[in-house]
Curated annotation (Swiss-Prot):
Protein name: Hydrogen cyanide synthase subunit HcnA
Any one Pfam family match given in the protein's UniProt record, by short name: Fer2_4
Keyword rRNA-binding: no
2Fe-2S ferredoxin-type domain segment(s): 16-97
Induction: Reduced oxygen levels.
UniProt-recorded Gene Ontology molecular function terms: 2 iron, 2 sulfur cluster binding; glycine dehydrogenase (cyanide-forming) activity; metal ion binding
Classification via InterPro entries: 2Fe-2S-bd_N (IPR042204), 2Fe-2S_ferredoxin-like_sf (IPR036010), 2Fe-2S_ferredoxin-type (IPR001041)
GO cellular component, one term: plasma membrane
Broadest EC class assigned to this enzyme: oxidoreductase
EC number(s) given by UniProt: 1.4.99.5
Ligand binding ([2Fe-2S] cluster): C60, C65, C68, C81
Function: A three-component membrane-bound flavoenzyme that catalyzes the formation of hydrogen cyanide, a secondary metabolite, by transfer of electrons to a cyanide-resistant branch of the aerobic respiratory chain.
Reactions that this protein is recorded to catalyse: glycine + 2 A = hydrogen cyanide + 2 AH2 + CO2
Length: 104
């Protein structure tokens, strides 16, 4: 499986310290960068869906608006802008909604 290309970095990634998985695809990441930075670097802008099925993406980039919610390692509703990447991390976009069967 080949790595997703980071075509949208502001500066080229000088050193990839790890690999994480975005929607099942591996991508290089650097220590200290956020999940949102990696998502932006590979061009993933649609991160979630609202109650009306409309796509949404990151808005504030600092954890206030909660528009960048993704599932990380199976845990829903994690803020991509506030989460630092870890080796082997698994990120799923547009999967932050609870299914009816999962509701308490």
């Amino acid at each position: 499986m080949h790595l997703l290309e980071r075509q949208h970095d502001i500066q080229p990634l000088s050193r990839a310290d790890m690999t994480i998985h975005l929607n099942g695809q591996p991508v290089a990441a650097a220590a200290g960068e956020t999940v949102l930075n990696v998502l932006n670097a590979v061009g993933l802008r649609r991160l979630a869906r609202n109650d009306h099925g409309q796509a949404s993406g990151a808005f504030c980039g600092m954890g206030v608006c909660h528009c960048c919610l993704v599932a990380i390692d199976g845990r829903p509703k994690r803020r991509a802008c506030q989460t630092v990447v870890r080796p082997g991390m698994r990120v799923e976009t547009e999967s932050n909604r609870f299914d009816q069967e999962e509701r308490p």
